[in-house]
Amino acid sequence: MTGDLHKEIRLVDNQYFAQAAERLASGTAVRLSVMGNSMLPFIIGGKDQVTLVPYTGQDLPLGIAALYQWEGKYMIHRLVKKDESHYHFLGDGNICRFETIKRNEVLGILQTIHHPDGKETDTTGRCWLHLGMIWYHIRPVRRYLLFIFRKLFLRSAR
């Protein structure tokens, strides 16, 4: 029974993002609530919301976060590598699972993170991009930093 419930929740999430992808394809920005911890510590699932803007085919800078579909699932992760025909993404809360997509498979660009306290983070500026790439390059110690972050901030917020 719990397995069915888990599948149902994932299906709803996928439908939710599919609707957002349709709006982005029509040229409309979307604001979404996000779930999951794959973008910790920068995006806290279940608390933060994000605004995505349509992708217009421009070359994306390293460090930007984008919405795309990979293996049938919608993701919002950070661009960490690129070549002539592909983008390679990795969630900030992940250590080693890269998602590779064709450049034209990007659906939207993360523009703003809306935090519960009313603060907003611009995710297209130089500071965000550089901070994200620094975070990417310290992968060997990220596991420990994420463990501390979860213990200090996520458990105390419950």
Predicted regions and their residues:
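Extended hydrophobic leader/signal-anchor segments used for secretion and membrane insertion
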Residues: M1-R158
